[in-house]
Amino acid sequence: MARKCEICGKGPQFGNRVSHSNRKTRHKFNPNIQSVRIEINGVSRKVKICTSCLRSLKKSV
């Protein structure tokens, strides 16, 4: 379950790197995953979440 957000399920996406001469090579875009200790139902737990979910959590508190 590496490189996947435990809250929203956001995972890697695939695309191309495009050079100036328009050659294309496959590339994987990983989400920005951070390990954060948060409290869920009164229990402190370490979860891997993306930064957009982390931002939403901080705004809701």
From Swiss-Prot:
GO terms for biological process: translation. GO terms for molecular function: structural constituent of ribosome. Keywords: Ribonucleoprotein, Ribosomal protein. Pfam families: Ribosomal_L28 (PF00830). The keyword Transferase does not apply. GO terms for cellular component: ribonucleoprotein complex; ribosome. Belongs to the bacterial ribosomal protein bL28 family. NCBIfam families: L28. This is Large ribosomal subunit protein bL28. The lineage of its organism: Bacteria, Pseudomonadati, Campylobacterota, Epsilonproteobacteria, Nautiliales.
